[in-house]
UniProtKB/Swiss-Prot annotation:
This is Protein FlmC. It comes from Escherichia coli (strain K12). It holds the Pfam family DUF5431. The keyword Protein biosynthesis does not apply. Component of a type I toxin-antitoxin (TA) system. Either this protein or sequences upstream of it are required for translation of downstream flmA; this could be translationally coupled to flmA. The lineage of its organism: Bacteria, Pseudomonadati, Pseudomonadota, Gammaproteobacteria, Enterobacterales. Disulfide bonds: none annotated. Induction: Part of the flmC-flmA operon; the antisense antitoxin RNA flmB of this system overlaps the ribosome-binding site and first 3 codons of this gene on the opposite strand.
Amino acid sequence: MLRQHQDSLLLRFAQGEEGHETTTQLSCLVCVDRVSHTVDIHLSDTKIAVRDSLQRRIQGGGGFHGLRIR
């Protein structure tokens, strides 16, 4: 069988394999799992994403209006 290839923005040495991944440092990445078609969102500051609705109203939305991560 063919080995399944993972497209990712991680550094090549972090994955343990060689590939065509970019080494650009990004603060926010969105990765889609090809098997289950789910989205995994990686944020540099998770405190912004997990605030409750009262904190968002007081502190501002931070550009994540309507985004729910569970």
